[in-house]
Amino acid sequence: TLLLECFDCTNGATGRNHGLLHSGARYAVTDEESARECNEENMLLRKIASHCVEETDGLFITLPDDDLAYQAKFVEACTAAGIRADIIDPKEAKILEPAVNPSLIGAVRVPDGAVDPFRLTMANALDAKIHGAELLTYHEVTNLIIENGVVLGVEALDHKTKEVKKFYANITINAAGIWGHNVAEKAGVAVKMFPAKGALLVYGHRVNNMVINRC
């Protein structure tokens, strides 16, 4: 097994995220399938990569301008998706998370968490190498090697030497993430996916200890 990484591991979107390990609760009302899958992945990561996960838990809070009756619908949807969702007293929520909005009138505790994307990625890479895989960083896939409609391998640019190299394999997997549509196009396959920019505000310290969402 050979993994080609365009630059350093976690150099792209992998290392530029909020580090939130979703419980799936935020999707429960509108997309039960995604919520269930999210929760299953959450529990799996806690099991196989506990050293990369911080079990902070999360709060979905209701503010005075919100409809408190929605809380019951939210909890019901979470339960249907297999997600733990416990209604707690606002006073308890303030004790658990002192930084929460003090005007809250309702709170639901869910198994959200925090994940270290750098440590998790490198742990995956190390485990793969231990099991015989090879990892080449600074190797950008520039083309696919195709004969008679069959993908036989890839061409990759070594960003350090500027040399174009060819790698052949019985199976070639497109693991380019959000940029996967660019690789797919080289095989004449259209993937309806594109990256969307977002903004994150980064502090030099932690403001709150639990994940806080508005219910």
Can you describe what each PLM-predicted range is?
Residues K160-I171, A175:
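Core beta-strand elements of the Rossmann-like FAD/NAD(P) dinucleotide-binding domain
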Residues G19-E92, L96:
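Dinucleotide-binding Rossmann-like beta1-alpha1 core, especially the glycine-rich loop
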